[in-house]
């Protein structure tokens, strides 16, 4: 084709040269917005999210303030190790929501402010009617004429913004109306501002000061993590802003649909479910269900709320009112929500093992599993066997009852002199077993008791006070000489010695961390390849155009 073009008459070559130059310049240098936008995105790599905590009104003493700051710093560090975003060009400035009474609807200044809102100076820029956002964090507020290139008046100049930040977290500790409600929450949170792609750019947490002292440091961290995940995306209102493409696919040009995701929440079998690709992938793998419309259910109590279903996801950090920290986990399905938002890339190796409902099938959230059935008020063991527990209803509807651990029921803690029976042992090696063993000649209903345990080559051994080690075959029971009753051994599907051979203790910190799957590694390497390939073909195209222009000359 090049040889044919060189046969043009010299008088026509200027025209051909102009056309070719225009085409080359358009395709490579930015005239084609789709190509150019994709090239920019490929060159913009996600980076660790930078979260800036901005402390506002704090009604705490110095000790509790220090505890809050330390706990939140640890939470922010953990979140930053999990999520990456397209970095904000410094500084981060939040676009004002208020201040303009009417905008231009046509002309060169379309969508710019035409008239000020007279009430705005008195009200100021508020976040969810809770507090005023610092003016130094906000964009300019000005009024424009219909055709002018410069604003007619600048009411508020642009603030200096927040440097080296992708998300601003406003922190308050104020005894608000919400803090005085019946549930007496430790904290609550919401988002304030979003960027042009829908990602939350700012949000706030309010810690209720009157409840602060009653929470342990571990529980404080867990609740703060729960709330931070809310403001970053785990909120029913934000589900509707999720993008059609994950950030990974969008950056690798595997998906070019910039629309928001359509109908992410759907009612299936009477329950609202989050049916987005990564969430469904993780849910199907966890529950061992391949139904097309299977996904984790959301809380439904008077409407669809911003939490997982209490029963199906029992033990997940994003259920309402999470349990004790050592029995609550940041699971893969929760992390998948953020992948599906289209705003973050996620490090799944940071997820914790979540064993509730594992391989229980498609109907686990619809019917009570036989292995998790209990009678209200009955004393037994938590499903992970780390604590004794009491059978309670999980929701006001009373659809499901499970064994719930309460403070003081941990087998790893306690005073051995205060044991419920003289046979119990409280230690880091102790777990909960259903037993009705007694030194008396009376029979009683089995209840949860704490005994020491060992795992050797997958075999479970149990030790009571004043006994030696006894093998406890899965699904069977053992009797002890001179004692009445039995110790019930956990079923084969239980988790005490599962893949943990020769481990003599199970603690909250020793639960195995999930490693990123091979598929995620493949995706990462593909992104690198795709980016390099795109750059390679762009360079070849430039050389092609240059050579063609040279021949024309």
Which stretches of residues belong to each language-model region?
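Intrinsic-disorder/low-complexity regions
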Residues: 1, 11, 163, 517, ...
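A detector of low-complexity, intrinsically disordered, Ser/Thr/Gly/Pro/Ala-rich segments
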Residues: 1, 436, 520-526, 536, ...
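N-terminal signal peptide
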Residues: 4-9, 17-35, 530, 548-553
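Bacterial N-terminal signal peptides that target proteins for export
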Residues: 6-15, 536-540
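Terminal low-complexity, poorly structured segments
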Residues: 11, 19, 294, 522, ...
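Extracellular zinc-dependent metalloprotease catalytic-domain scaffold
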Residues: 21-225, 231-516
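Extracellular mucin-like PTS segments
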Residues: 509-533
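Cleavable C-terminal sorting propeptides in eukaryotic secreted/cell-surface proteins
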Residues: 527-553
